[in-house]
Regions:
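Active-site neighborhoods and metal-handling regions in enzymes and metal-associated proteins
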Residues: 1-232
Length: 232
């Protein structure tokens, strides 16, 4: 039996559909409920309870179908990149890095603080990325934050609440580009003006933490969630 992929069919390019439909069954995501309702009660269904939505768990349990908690087999396969993906990621990051370098130079040497705010500088960064012929879109809405706004997790600037630059600011930009060969996500905190003694101390502590982390030997079984406290 073929595996089945439930997806919004209108979002799938026709060429891709033709390539993979010989290997798997393609079903419209809107039909998944009715298909689940027709599963034989003698069947057993494997689900990852940590990531499956309650909708599907509830649907199967109402039909008294036996469910088993299994690790999602796609996770590891998605995490392991092939040579084409690795090469694309490297090239995308190099090109994106050029845009970021131009942006930081512009912020420090060209940008007029009196006529710019959190939104206008984010738009300038996007314009630099768009000059790349392989640029598709932003990988997420740019987090552009001046001073105290930079302390807010996943800050979202609005036209009404935007902050303006002065002669002395800390500016955080968390942004990324979606390219046809890779996706980027980069965060930089930039001092515009003269850094205070306290700022120098805090930045130095963070740098020391990063250096120590980069030299750390991770034992087998170390989780990504362990990285933060190790750096601290």
């Amino acid at each position: 039996n073929k595996h089945s992929l439930f997806i919004k069919e209108s979002a799938m390019p026709e060429l891709l559909k033709q390539e993979i439909q010989t290997l798997i069954n393609i079903n419209n995501i809107e039909n998944i409920g009715s298909i689940f309702n027709n599963i034989n009660s003698s069947e057993s269904i494997g689900l990852d309870f940590n990531s499956t939505t309650f909708y599907f768990l509830d649907l199967l349990r109402k039909q008294k179908i036996n469910t088993k908690n299994l690790a999602n087999p796609c996770i590891l396969l998605k995490a392991i990149k092939n040579e084409t993906e690795l090469d694309g990621a490297k090239k995308a990051h190099i090109r994106d890095g050029v845009s970021i370098t131009k942006y930081i130079y512009w912020l420090k040497n060209i940008m007029d603080p009196k006529s710019n705010d959190e939104i206008s500088v984010a738009q300038h960064l996007e314009s630099l990325r768009r000059k790349n012929e392989l640029f598709h879109s932003l990988s997420f809405d740019t987090i552009s934050a001046i001073d105290k706004n930079a302390a807010l997790p996943h800050y979202r600037v609005t036209e009404e609440g935007k902050s303006f630059f002065s002669d002395n600011n800390i500016y955080l930009v968390d942004s990324g580009g979606q390219y046809f060969d890779g996706t980027t996500d980069i965060t930089r905190t930039i001092i515009l003006g003269e850094a205070t003694t306290e700022q120098k101390d805090r930045f130095t502590r963070v740098l020391k933490g990063h250096i120590a982390l980069s030299n750390h030997v991770f034992e087998k079984g170390t989780k990504g969630t362990d990285i933060d406290y190790l750096a601290r």
